[in-house]
Amino acid sequence: MLSSTDLVQAVTADLGKIRETAPLVLSLTNSVVQPLTANLLLAIGAVPAMLNDAEEAVDMLRSGTGALLVNLGTVTREQGAAMQTAVREANRLNIPWVLDPVAVGALSLRTRLAGQLKEQSPRIIRGNASEIMALAGYSSVTKGPESTSSSADALHAARELALHTGAAVLVTGRTDYSTDGRQVTATENGHAMMSRVTGVGCSMGALSAACAAVSPTPLQAAVSTAVLMGIAGEMAFEQSPSPGSFAVSLLDSLYALSPEDVVRRARFLSL
């Protein structure tokens, strides 16, 4: 288990690598969050590519993509087939990919698709408590895409899911938990206003893909995601305490985020 000092150093290293290498993140994501997702990736220093077609996704993966995001937020049967194709190609090319199983457990099409995708070697699975519990095979209660359980409630399911899939699992909530099934890191950065803006959670999936493109391990990428987004959320609220302006300030805060901010603000919870 890394010390808090080691964790902070790893997060700042990931931030620096993203800005130095500008990884291309191919996002097969939902239509509601595409603008925020693309702008968030640009703000942190990555390069977004937003596609839905299977043939074009394969072409993009072969052109030097750093990571792939698969987000099920507004999935259709056609898009689901494209996701399957993209995942197979990413695995063939050894490109890390992230599964964001939005509203899994609440709706049948995406629940079936997520069950298939989780068996195809995602590097990171990012979800709220209800989504992670459902994907792990536990009963959960959702309110649309929102969780009615706490992230701590899903920790056991997250560890089981990580061991089963080989992925790092990032459970987001008031406390964010990152686990590979053996190690667990809990981070307490963030602000409640983040839950009042559509797409922030989904954009964390995109950020985790950017981190996965540069980080030495999926678990470290998950931790970096939680810390960087959480700190940016805190900084954004200090500037803009209302939802509309907060969304803009979140992008500004990610753009301005410095290693010193990480050192000063990162908060890890002892388990």
Curated annotation (Swiss-Prot):
It comes from the Bacteria. It catalyses: 5-(2-hydroxyethyl)-4-methylthiazole + ATP = 4-methyl-5-(2-phosphooxyethyl)-thiazole + ADP + H(+). It is an enzyme of class 2 (transferase). Belongs to the Thz kinase family. It comes from Akkermansia muciniphila (strain ATCC BAA-835 / DSM 22959 / JCM 33894 / BCRC 81048 / CCUG 64013 / CIP 107961 / Muc). Pfam families: HK. Keywords: ATP-binding, Kinase, Magnesium, Metal-binding, Nucleotide-binding, Thiamine biosynthesis, Transferase. Pathway: Cofactor biosynthesis; thiamine diphosphate biosynthesis; 4-methyl-5-(2-phosphoethyl)-thiazole from 5-(2-hydroxyethyl)-4-methylthiazole: step 1/1. This is Hydroxyethylthiazole kinase. One of its GO terms (biological process) is thiamine diphosphate biosynthetic process. Substrate binds at M50, G199. ATP binds at R126, T172. The keyword Plastid does not apply. Its EC number is 2.7.1.50.
